Amino acid sequence: MSEVRVGENESLDSALRRFKKKCAEAGVLAELRKREHYESPSVRRKKKSEAARRRKRR
């Protein structure tokens, strides 16, 4: 979990901005979206191979 300490003279807005940036860098939201619904291993393999195919084509 990302943690941000608010300084004495720091506004709450800037602390919130730093927190959001840390969460984005840590990939918290991406991980949340990925785990929102269960994916069976076969579906995961299929998505992975399709992504590799798309990367290879470009």
Curated annotation (Swiss-Prot):
Q: Does the keyword Glycoprotein apply?
A: no
Q: Report residue spans for region: Disordered.
A: 34-58
Specify residue ranges for compositional bias: Basic residues: 43-58
Q: What is this protein called?
A: Small ribosomal subunit protein bS21
Q: What gene, per UniProt, encodes this protein?
A: rpsU
Please tell me the species this chain comes from: Caldicellulosiruptor saccharolyticus (strain ATCC 43494 / DSM 8903 / Tp8T 6331)
Q: What keywords sit in the KW lines?
A: Ribonucleoprotein, Ribosomal protein
One GO CC term on file = ribosome
Q: Name one GO biological process term.
A: translation
Name the family the entry cites: Belongs to the bacterial ribosomal protein bS21 family.
Q: State if Ribonucleoprotein is listed as a keyword.
A: yes
UniProt-recorded Gene Ontology molecular function terms? structural constituent of ribosome
